[in-house]
Amino acid sequence: MKKIEGIVPVMLTPFTPDNQIDYPGLEKLISWYLKEGVDALFAVCQSSEMQYLSLEERVELARFVVQKVEGRVPVIASGHISDDLAEQTKELQAMANTGIDALVLVTNHLDPQNQGSETFYAHLNHLLKTLPADMPLGLYECPAPYRRLLSDDEFSFCANSGRFVVLKDVSCDLPTVERRVKLAQGTPLAIINANAAIAWPAMQAGSKGFSGVFTNFHPGLYHWLYHHGAQQPEKAHELSLFLSLSAVTETLGYPKNAKIYHQRLGTFASEHCRVNKDNVLEKFWGLSVLLDQIRD
C-alpha cells in the first residue's frame, strides 16, 4: 500500500478546440507536474472536469495517467459522479481497474440529498462490500454539487476501518484539520488540506501535504513549503502569505484561467473547458496581468 502524501495536484484535463481530450497535451502536463517535484497525482477530480466527462473518458484518462507516470509517483482518481448507488458502483468498479494506487470516494455522493449519517453509512458500507478489498481508498469533500463535510464519527469510522489512506480535506478550517489529525493517529489515513489560506499552519499541524487548485500553478513552491519550510520558518511564513493571496485568483474563472496559464507556458495548446465557457480574460479585468505575475 503506497502512502499518499505530500503535494498532490488536482489535475487539469486539456481539451482540443473541438472538445476532445488532448492526450499529447496531457502527457506534457504530466511531465510538468513531475518536473515540479509533486509527490502524487489526483487524476480524475473536480479540476479535471470529471462531472463533464463520460465514464469511458474518465476511465481512459485515469489509465493514461497511470501509464505515463510509470510508477514514479502514486496516482489516485475518483470519477463517480452519479447519485444513484448502482451507477456509482459501476463507475467506481471501472475506475478500480485502471491501475490507480487509490480510489477516492466523493463524500457528497455518499449522501446525495444531505440526509445525514444513516444514508452516508448505508452507501459507504455497500461500496466497501462491493469494491475490491485490496484497493486502497480515499475520501474527497468535493465542493460540487455540494460540500458534504464528514462528521467526526464518520471520519473516525473511515479511519479505523483500515481501508482509507487519504482524505482531501475541504473543511478550510484549521481547527477541523487539527482535530482530524488527532483522530487519525494510529490509522493509515492521511489528511491532506486543500485550502491555500491555511496551507502552512495545516502542514505544521500534521496535514500530510497540500492538494488545492493552485498546485496547477506553482506546485514547486508548495513542495518547498512542505518538505523544507520547517528548516526556514521565516521564509516559509512569507511564502505562505504569497501562496494564500495568489490562490484568490481561483475565483477569476478557474479552471479556465489555469489552462490559459499553461497555454502561455506552452504545456498545451488550447484553453478550452467544458465547465467554463466564459471569456475569462474579458470577464475579469486584470486577470491576464495576474497570470503573468504568478508565472514570474
Give each language-model segment a name:
Residues L26, A62, Q88, L124, ...:
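A general structural signal for well-ordered alpha-helical segments in protein cores
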Residues E60-K68, L92-A102, F155-F164, H227, ...:
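Short, electropositive alpha-helical surface patch
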Residues L53-L55, Q115-E118, R179-R180, Q204, ...:
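Short secondary-structure transition/capping segments
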Residues K2-R147:
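Active-site beta->alpha loop and helix N-cap motifs at the rims of alpha/beta catalytic domains
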Residues V8-L12, E36, S207, F214-D296:
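C-terminal alpha-helical cap/extension of soluble enzyme domains
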Residues G25, E57, T119, H123, ...:
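Soluble or luminal CAZymes and related metallo-dependent hydrolases
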Residues E49-M50, D111-P112, P175, W200, ...:
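Short secondary-structure capping/turn micro-motifs that flank functional sites
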Residues L128-P132, C142-L252:
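Catalytic alpha/beta core domains of metabolic enzymes, predominantly
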